[in-house]
Amino acid sequence: MTEGRNKEELEDITLLGNQNNKYDFDYRPDVLESFDNKHQGRDYFVKFNCPEFTSLCPITGQPDFATIYISYIPNIKMVESKSLKLYLFSFRNHGDFHEDCMNIIMNDLIELMDPHYIEVWGKFTPRGGISIDPYTNYGRPDSKYEKMAEHRLMNHDLYPEKIDNR
């Protein structure tokens, strides 16, 4: 049986359980926090389903809404979920295209965690009769994860869901 985490392992986690969190409406990658992966010898997926993502159209300033799916195979570090929530919330007044938002999120998480593999998929609600679903991924170069990333990219939407107005 594995022991729980000790206080030293949790000292960098400052947002979880804090009642005085500030909800910033402007892009803040510095709010992301990480903790050590205690299972580094094993490949496994961590998946976040984020159904309340909001950003702004950079041209019109109108809000865009999406469900974002973030899946990764951790290496040494993992993202703390409360900090991820606050980070995603910080896109509320950020003006960028859907594709840019997904790549920014992925790049920030790569910088934070240096995962073996990560993918970010945004499923945006329709505007003007069109929904946009950008998918981006990354696998560590010169590893099996790089090959995995290529395979998943080429096959990520073989069975698209039926769109019925989300």
UniProtKB/Swiss-Prot annotation:
GO terms for MF: preQ1 synthase activity
Pathway this chain belongs to: tRNA modification; tRNA-queuosine biosynthesis
Broad class of enzyme this protein falls into: oxidoreductase
Chief localisation class: cytoplasm
Residues that bind substrate: 79-81, 98-99
GO cellular component: cytoplasm
EC number of this enzyme: 1.7.1.13
Cellular location(s): Cytoplasm
GO biological process, any: queuosine biosynthetic process
Leader sequence residues: none
Matching Gene3D superfamilies: 3.30.1130.10
Alphabetized UniProt keyword annotations: Cytoplasm, NADP, Oxidoreductase, Queuosine biosynthesis
Record field: catalytic activity: 7-aminomethyl-7-carbaguanine + 2 NADP(+) = 7-cyano-7-deazaguanine + 2 NADPH + 3 H(+)
Record's function text: Catalyzes the NADPH-dependent reduction of 7-cyano-7-deazaguanine (preQ0) to 7-aminomethyl-7-deazaguanine (preQ1).
PANTHER family (alphabetical): NADPH-DEPENDENT 7-CYANO-7-DEAZAGUANINE REDUCTASE
Protein name as it appears in the record: NADPH-dependent 7-cyano-7-deazaguanine reductase
Organism whose genome encodes this protein: Staphylococcus saprophyticus subsp. saprophyticus (strain ATCC 15305 / DSM 20229 / NCIMB 8711 / NCTC 7292 / S-41)
